[in-house]
């Protein structure tokens, strides 16, 4: 199985390589190439087998091919075209420049250096030769100029001499022809019959000229009119034999070519009308192409703007959209309904332009059909008039010959008379039958059909190309919308994730803040409790200090009192001692 897959892959690569190298348009047109390779290019082409199966297999034509073509155009071809555009873009942006730089740097530069050396070494040599060649041509021209002038002078003199001789010969020939013609026409009594009516002349003057020349040739076989008049032993029917032959041939020829004359006049009329009509239609088709091209450019521009960027206006807070390059501001945000409306607008304009061309075709075809019917009716009337005149006039001529023959009591003329009348009746019936055929004749409008086929092919090609391009653009738009929607969905999901993360962060911060506040509150409570305890301690210490102070003051007062008492006692003691020393009695208080 693996070998089979490798074999198929190798065979496919080999076939496509041969097709790429040999099966191009130039190679196919070259008849000197190998027949087997041309056959290979033909039989390896999928379009050949597709056309072959469409032509020879009804089931493939009606069932398989439409479904396969529709699915291919819908699911495969747009992606192939997009891949080709991407590959061409890669080639133009990177590969082409890289290849050109490589070729220019590695090969062209070397060849240019070698060529410059060759040019410098041979330039002087070729310059000398070109100067010598110019001098030689100039000398040759001077030598041949006089020789050519002499030849022209001799040739002009010879031409003038020959022209004079030819003019004299032509005048003599014209005189002889006029003399012979007048002699022949005066020798016959049926000149009116041989001269065609104006109606028959308008159908085809060439047939009359042929018939007249044939009559003159028949007259020439009799040498002169004198010989005809010197044969009294011939009957009237025998004398009118040449006239009968000429008349039968004229009527038979013109009758047989009546339909051909009609087709020829219609063809000339169509060729005359189709040329300006073709110019008008070409202008309409070119206008049609330009309109479609403008609509396609508008659609392509909007499809390219699907892949856009957005920003928020800092002043208004409005979302502003920019093209992919980020420089051009978009008038609106490109949506699927908007692109669908553009596709519908293109289809409606395409249909309107196509209807305009179709209406023009229909009106012009109706006008041409009306004029062709008039030409047909005119030809029928002309043929009827010509047939009536030719039949009636010749019947009178035959009746006159019949009377003259009866006057001479010629019994031998009865068989000739029967034969000529039988041929006359047969030809009359043929003229009537051809008239009926001319009335029912289906006019050939080959130029018109060919022109309409070309126009239809042109319109079909435009329609096909436009539909294929619309399919490609529709697929491209769908891909861009899918990519943008996927990107927007990812951005939306990313925003949701970021928003969720932000909310979680805010919630976490809030929780941390609450915890910190609670901690701060606890710390504040602890601090307050410490402050209260410290205050109570300080108050207690102050109270204790106050009590100690009071105790100290009381102690000091007690000490002061004791000191005061001691002092007083000391004073009393001193007074006592002083009194004792002075021998005075103690004070009364002390005595008490």
From Swiss-Prot:
Its main location: mitochondrion. One of its GO terms (cellular component) is ribonucleoprotein complex. Residues 354-385, 448-583 form a coiled coil. This is Outer spore wall assembly protein SHE10. GO terms for biological process: sporulation resulting in formation of a cellular spore. Keywords: Coiled coil, Mitochondrion, Ribonucleoprotein, Signal, Sporulation. It is found in: Mitochondrion. It comes from Vanderwaltozyma polyspora (strain ATCC 22028 / DSM 70294 / BCRC 21397 / CBS 2163 / NBRC 10782 / NRRL Y-8283 / UCD 57-17) (Kluyveromyces polysporus). The gene is SHE10. Residues 1-23 form the signal peptide. Transmembrane segments: none annotated. Component of the mitochondria-localized RNase mitochondrial RNA-processing (RNase MRP) composed of one single RNA encoded by the NME1 gene and at least 31 proteins. Absent in the nucleus-localized RNase MRP (NuMRP). Involved in spore wall assembly. May be a component of the mitochondrial RNase MRP (MtMRP), a ribonucleoprotein endoribonuclease involved in the cleaving RNA transcripts to generate primers for DNA replication in mitochondria. Residues 507-592 are annotated as: Disordered. Residues 507-580 have a biased composition (Basic and acidic residues).
């Amino acid at each position: 199985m693996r070998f089979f897959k490798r074999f198929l892959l190798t065979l496919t690569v080999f076939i496509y390589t041969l097709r790429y190298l040999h099966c191009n348009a130039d190679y196919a047109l070259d008849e000197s190439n190998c027949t087997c390779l041309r056959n290979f290019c033909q039989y390896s082409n999928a379009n050949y087998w597709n056309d072959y199966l469409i032509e020879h297999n009804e089931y493939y034509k009606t069932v398989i091919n439409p479904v396969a073509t529709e699915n291919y155009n819908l699911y495969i071809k747009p992606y192939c075209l997009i891949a080709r555009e991407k590959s061409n873009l890669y080639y133009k942006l990177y590969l082409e420049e890289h290849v050109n730089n490589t070729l220019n740097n590695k090969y062209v530069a070397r060849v240019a250096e070698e060529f410059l050396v060759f040019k410098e070494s041979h330039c002087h040599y070729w310059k000398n030769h070109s100067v010598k060649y110019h001098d030689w041509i100039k000398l040759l021209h001077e030598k041949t100029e006089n020789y050519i002038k002499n030849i022209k002078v001799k040739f002009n003199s010879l031409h003038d001499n020959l022209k004079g001789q030819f003019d004299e010969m032509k005048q003599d020939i014209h005189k002889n022809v006029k003399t012979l013609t007048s002699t022949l026409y005066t020798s016959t009594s049926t000149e009116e019959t041989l001269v065609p009516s104006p109606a028959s002349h308008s159908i085809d003057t060439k047939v009359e000229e042929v018939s007249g020349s044939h009559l003159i040739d028949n007259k020439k076989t009799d040498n002169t009119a004198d010989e005809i008049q010197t044969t009294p032993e011939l009957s009237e029917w025998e004398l009118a034999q040449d006239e009968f032959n000429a008349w039968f041939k004229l009527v038979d020829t013109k009758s047989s070519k009546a339909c051909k004359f009609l087709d020829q006049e219609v063809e000339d009329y169509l060729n005359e009308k189709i040329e300006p009509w073709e110019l008008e239609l070409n202008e309409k088709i070119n206008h049609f192409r330009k309109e479609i091209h403008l609509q396609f450019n508008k659609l392509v521009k909007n499809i390219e703007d699907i892949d856009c960027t957005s920003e928020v206006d800092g002043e208004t807070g409005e979302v502003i959209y920019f093209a992919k390059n980020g420089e051009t501001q978009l008038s609106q945000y490109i949506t699927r309904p908007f692109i669908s409306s553009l596709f519908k607008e293109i289809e409606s304009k395409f249909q309107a332009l196509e209807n305009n061309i179709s209406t023009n075709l229909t009106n012009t075809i109706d006008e041409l059909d009306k004029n062709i019917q008039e030409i047909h009716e005119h030809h029928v009337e002309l043929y009827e008039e010509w047939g009536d005149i030719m039949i009636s006039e010749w019947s009178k001529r035959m009746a006159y010959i019949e009377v003259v023959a009866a006057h001479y009591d010629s019994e031998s003329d009865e068989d000739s008379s029967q034969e000529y009348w039988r041929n006359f009746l047969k030809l009359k019936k043929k003229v009537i039958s051809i008239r009926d055929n001319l009335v029912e004749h289906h006019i050939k409008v080959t130029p018109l059909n060919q022109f309409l086929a070309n126009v239809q092919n042109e319109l079909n090609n435009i329609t096909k190309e436009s539909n294929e391009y619309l399919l490609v653009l529709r697929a491209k738009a769908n891909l861009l919308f899918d990519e943008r929607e996927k990107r927007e969905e990812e951005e939306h999901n990313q925003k949701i994730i970021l928003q969720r993360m932000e909310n979680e962060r805010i919630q976490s911060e809030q929780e941390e803040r609450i915890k910190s506040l609670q901690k701060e509150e606890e710390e504040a409570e602890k601090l307050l409790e410490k402050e209260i305890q410290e205050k109570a301690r300080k108050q207690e210490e102050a109270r204790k200090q106050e009590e100690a102070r009071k105790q100290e003051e009381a102690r000091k007062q007690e000490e002061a009192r004791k000191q005061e008492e001691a002092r007083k006692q000391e004073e009393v003691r001193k007074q006592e001692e002083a009194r004792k020393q002075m021998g005075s009695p103690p004070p009364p208080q002390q005595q008490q």
